[in-house]
Amino acid sequence: MNIQVINKSKHPLPAYATELSAGMDIRANISEPISLAPMQRCLVPTGLFIALPQGFEAQIRPRSGLALKKGITVLNSPGTIDADYRGEICIILVNLSAETFVIEDGERIAQMVIARHEQAVWKEVEVLDETERGAGGFGHTGRG
């Protein structure tokens, strides 16, 4: 699939690390480092602008290594970039650790997954179809 992209950053375009990777790493495009204190959040620009085909979205997800080792994650995970959005892709990061984390220019801060989606059409009814599970939730299956 071809996706139109404008790269106003100083960094390479997002790319798949391996042949079977689902996500592409996205880099910070900042003029100076950002110090992210514990429990602080910030909006990090990427310098990327994209035009997705109809029926697709870009999901912005945390990088597992950054989350595990440093406590840095995407606050609204997954962040959604709609096919009709044409602004700069910016990432909302939050520091869930007890230590300040410094984001450097060009640092890989999140990953982007391109995914198909459907738009739902609501059908109002008086009663829902019965299922074995019914209304059970939040640990109902005994596994949590």
UniProtKB/Swiss-Prot annotation:
It catalyses: dUTP + H2O = dUMP + diphosphate + H(+). Keywords: Hydrolase, Magnesium, Metal-binding, Nucleotide metabolism. InterPro entries: dUTPase, dUTPase-like, dUTPase-like_sf, dUTPase_trimeric. Its EC number is 3.6.1.23. Substrate binds at R63, S64, G65, N76, T80, I81, D82. The keyword Magnesium applies. GO terms for biological process: dUMP biosynthetic process; dUTP catabolic process. The keyword Transmembrane helix does not apply. One of its GO terms (molecular function) is dUTP diphosphatase activity. Its cofactor is Mg(2+). Pathway: Pyrimidine metabolism; dUMP biosynthesis; dUMP from dCTP (dUTP route): step 2/2. HAMAP family: dUTPase_bact (MF_00116). This enzyme is involved in nucleotide metabolism: it produces dUMP, the immediate precursor of thymidine nucleotides and it decreases the intracellular concentration of dUTP so that uracil cannot be incorporated into DNA. Belongs to the dUTPase family. This is Deoxyuridine 5'-triphosphate nucleotidohydrolase. It comes from Bacteroides fragilis (strain ATCC 25285 / DSM 2151 / CCUG 4856 / JCM 11019 / LMG 10263 / NCTC 9343 / Onslow / VPI 2553 / EN-2). The lineage of its organism: Bacteria, Pseudomonadati, Bacteroidota, Bacteroidia, Bacteroidales.
